[in-house]
Amino acid sequence: MTKFKLEYIWLDGYTPVPNLRGKTQIKEFDEFPTLEQLPLWGFDGSSTMQAEGSSDCVLKPVAIYPDPARTNGALVMCEVMMPDGHAHASNARATILDDEDAWFGFEQEYFFYQNGRPLGFPEQGYPAPQPYYTGVGYSNVGDVAREIVEEHLDLCLAAGINHEGINAEVAKGQWEFQIFGKGSKKAADQIWMARYLLQRLTEKYGIDIEYHCKPLGDTDWNGSGMHCNFSTKYLREVGGKEYFEALMASSDKNLMDHIAVYGPDNDKRLTGKHETAPWNKFSYGVADRGASIRVPHSFIKNDYKGYLEDRRPNSQGDPYQIVRRF
């Protein structure tokens, strides 16, 4: 029997943005445990905005990954449950219509922050604009950011997370990683776990991750988004112009229902500037990064079949709520 370090990870009850929480227990197994072997666990919900008075909450394992940063470690994604077995009110994952044929690709943007400002920013004022997007060299990315993003990439791949790439973004200290998942819950689990690994990794560098969609306020710097590329089996295999137009009409009709779960303060980011569409107006266009929905050229050439990109979700959006809305 081998002792395994099981890191149980969950989302707390803070709003509008839940925080990642985690704690470790040691259990013995003959080999790396399966999801079915993992026990339920508890925590004090009064300390996470998830209970008052009778404060016991239950952690239900729903996904497991190897933890490459620990010997005999496992990362356990959990749903928060009530003691009677019902899903906690903060448990957005439990409300998802899980569809293994729904595919999601998330483009997670974020800032490295140190001493209250983006990594690489001067103590006063701002750096010169550009050429940071996909930049190379010390003057563009500094001396530590690339080390972190490369280590994060390796951690995700070693954990079995379908990490698909990295790049420096438009503002100094701003980066992006991409996660692709087949299945509504699987895709959302993996982006949350990738966020967890990034935040845990940067502890040793004395750096925080800032996910706010417009951390530099009303300035001429791009905000941070989490563009969501999505498709269903029908959209990939059948599609068609008539179906596409009906889908766009439905998206227009349900505009505010989508905006409500696409992350807080999106009105500060979705202004019609910096490659965004206004938050209160729906639009779509071929290869148009200033539209709500960007339609790839390949989609049109393939008889309106394939994937679409919703550019409205922001960097603080909850992937569980986003895939639920889709």
UniProtKB/Swiss-Prot annotation:
This is Glutamine synthetase. GO terms for molecular function: ATP binding; glutamine synthetase activity; metal ion binding. L-glutamate binds at E275. Transferase activity is inhibited by NH(4)Cl. Its main location: cytoplasm. Residues 4-85 form the GS beta-grasp domain. InterPro entries: Gln_synt_N (IPR008147), Gln_synt_N_sf (IPR036651), Gln_synth/guanido_kin_cat_dom (IPR014746), Gln_synth_cat_dom (IPR008146), Gln_synth_gly_rich_site (IPR027303), Gln_synth_N_conserv_site (IPR027302), Glutamine_Synthetase (IPR050292). Its cofactor is Mg(2+). It catalyses: L-glutamate + NH4(+) + ATP = L-glutamine + ADP + phosphate + H(+). It is found in: Cytoplasm. Mg(2+) binds at E107, E109, E169, E176. Catalyzes the ATP-dependent biosynthesis of glutamine from glutamate and ammonia. The gene is glnII. Gene3D superfamilies: Glutamine synthetase, N-terminal domain (3.10.20.70), Glutamine synthetase/guanido kinase, catalytic domain (3.30.590.10). Residues 83-326 form the GS catalytic domain. PANTHER family: GLUTAMINE SYNTHETASE, GLUTAMINE SYNTHETASE 2 CYTOPLASMIC. Belongs to the glutamine synthetase family. GO terms for biological process: glutamine biosynthetic process; nitrogen fixation. It comes from the Bacteria. Its EC number is 6.3.1.2. Homooctamer and homotetramer. Keywords: ATP-binding, Cytoplasm, Ligase, Magnesium, Metal-binding, Nitrogen fixation, Nucleotide-binding. ATP binds at E164. GO terms for cellular component: cytoplasm. Induction: Up-regulated by the nitrogen regulatory protein NtrC. Two forms of glutamine synthetase (GSI and GSII) can be found in this nitrogen fixing bacteria, GSI is a typical prokaryotic glutamine synthetase whereas GSII is similar to the eukaryotic enzyme.
